[in-house]
Regions:
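Bacterial Sec-dependent N-terminal signal peptides
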Residues: 1-24, 477-482, 488
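Outer-membrane pore/translocation modules
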Residues: 24-50, 107, 122-129, 134-136, ...
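Surface-exposed loop and membrane-interface regions of Gram-negative outer-membrane beta-barrel proteins
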Residues: 18, 74-105, 117-136
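Transmembrane beta-strand segments of Gram-negative outer membrane beta-barrel proteins
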Residues: 20-62, 72-82, 164-168, 454
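Outer-membrane beta-barrel pore domains
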Residues: 259-272, 277-488
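Internal, well-ordered domain-core segments that constitute the primary functional module
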Residues: 118-228
């Protein structure tokens, strides 16, 4: 199915390119080297990079992408991208990072492929990453239909906008799990992905004050889980009915494992989105909250105020301080310490011990070793014993980011975070672990060498959660227009 999707994307690119009246093609080439010490690449070098930067220190990569952008002023338009990475000391020496085709009709989009996803709502340069989806893991191939941008709702006189969509996809980490699991650890293959969201924006374009409210949900379902000997232990159904059951969601049928019959089919998680903002011509400030839930107890706020709290400011003009973001990620309540599903022997339901991102059968909300959501719920790739699941999800982090222009052509970005970790409800740490991480990046461009970007960055970690790490990062990139054809 994954190869068929790639073939479909390449076919669509060739067909639409050959018949296009107007066609533009841009490129981006990048080289990046990291040198340092410690067991891992510093936290803010590796995380939120789409899985491109290796977790191993003293690593690097070469990257080449070809992209066509959408024409926003046309009723029908399309975009596509092909992005290849060659890596040193990463989990694969060469791989396709992005391959997608996106057709736009008015405000609607039909998308197929794998494309890096950053936070839908918050500052994409400075946010630490959403609780549900961030740019922390490698992209998941999927097919999507929806409204990717806020669109005016008819008959609301310019006061109500909506965005949202539905997608189904495939996890592509079967080989990764088999290679990196330790003996005695279970793994899964052919897992499926589902996501749906709807978000409303309340506020008139002519007024500065606005509010945002919505829900974003995702599901891991289907596939097969194997024990350490490679024996099939759980086979999840993945027929048409299962696609409908994860959309609603509903409990699994008789052919589903007992856990899916007692609860709902698949591993469900999501966020409620709330924000209040104030926007002027050249700046925007907003306060926001993502309430995270991993089951129905979280949906009814039994996990209190777990989630991501943030305050961000963004200025559009060049200035020494153009963007500032402060965030607090809290995942310490989890509805209480333990879970008990009602049974004939003990007819009591205790909906607690939410065990964020984890699952009773699946390894959890992880793709190729990286947490799909916030990096503060420690990614399984940090597990030195080959365990593919989460070992630290009871955690709290304080985070800050700032960026701006020092002089023409010279920009900076500073990220700082401090995190405490308690382990999990089922395997708590003996002592609370701490981690401080920071990064400072300088990037330089000059009008005489158009399209070139040179960057230098330093970062370090201090603590006992992922250890003491430090490194310098050197980067160079070149982007520009490759083709611009106007056919008559």
């Amino acid at each position: 199915m994954k190869r068929k999707l790639l073939f479909l994307i390449l076919t669509l690119i060739m067909v639409f390119t050959a018949s296009a009246k107007d066609f533009n093609l841009s490129y981006n080439a990048e080289a990046n080297v990291i040198c340092g010490g410690g067991d891992y690449t510093p936290f803010w070098f590796m995380n939120n990079t789409g899985g491109v930067v290796s977790d191993k220190n003293n690593s690097g990569y070469l990257r080449l992408g070809l992209f066509k952008s959408v024409a926003e002023d046309k009723k029908f338009s399309y975009s596509f991208g092909l992005d290849v990475v060659g890596a040193y000391r990463n989990e694969a020496p060469i791989y396709l990072q992005q391959a997608y085709f996106d057709a736009k009709l008015k405000n609607w989009s039909i998308f197929a492929g794998a494309r890096e996803e950053k936070s839908m709502m918050w500052d994409q340069e400075l946010s630490s990453g959403g609780m549900l989806i961030s740019n922390n893991a490698r992209p998941i191939p999927q097919i999507y239909i929806g409204l990717p941008k806020f669109t005016l709702v008819p008959f609301t006189k310019g006061w109500l906008y909506v965005r949202g969509g539905v997608s189904y996809g495939w996890f592509v980490d079967d080989c990764y799990q088999k290679e990196f699991k330790a003996e005695g650890m279970q793994y899964g293959e052919n897992l499926l992905y589902h996501r749906k969201n709807i978000i409303f924006k309340i506020g008139h374009q002519a007024k500065p004050l606005y509010g945002i409210i919505g829900i974003d949900m995702a599901t891991q379902f289907g596939g097969t889980v194997y024990d350490y000997l490679g024996n099939k232990t759980v086979k999840f159904p993945s027929g048409v009915k299962e696609y409908l059951k994860v959309f609603v969601p509903l409990a699994g049928g008789e052919d589903s494992p007992n856990i899916d019959q007692v609860n709902v089919s698949g591993n469900h998680l999501g966020i409620y989105i709330l924000a209040l903002g104030y926007k002027k011509a050249d700046w925007d400030i907003k306060a926001y909250y993502e309430h995270f839930f991993d089951d129905h107890s979280g949906m009814t706020f039994r996990n209190k105020f777990d989630g991501l709290w943030g305050l961000s400011f963004r200025k559009t003009d060049k200035f020494f301080v153009e963007g500032v973001t402060f965030e607090v990620m809290n995942a310490t309540n989890q509805s209480g310490p333990f879970l008990w599903d009602e049974s004939p022997e003990i007819p009591v339901q205790v909906s607690a011990g939410d065990n964020y991102y984890a699952h009773f059968v699946y390894n959890g909300w992880v793709h190729r070793g990286h947490s799909i959501g916030t990096p503060f719920i420690t990614s399984p790739l940090y597990n030195k014993d080959g365990y593919l699941g989460f070992t630290n999800n009871i955690t709290r982090a304080f985070y800050g980011g700032v960026d701006g222009t020092i002089i023409d052509g010279l920009r900076y970005k500073l990220l700082v975070s401090h995190q405490r970790g308690w382990g999990t409800s089922y395997a708590p740490y003996t002592n609370i672990k701490h981690q401080f991480s920071t990064m400072l990046q300088l990037s330089y461009t000059h009008e005489k060498v158009k399209g070139w970007n040179f960057s230098l960055a330093g970062a370090f970690d201090k603590g006992n959660l992922i250890g003491d790490n430090w490194a310098l990062q050197f980067g160079i990139s070149k982007s520009g227009e490759l083709l611009n054809l106007s056919k008559k």
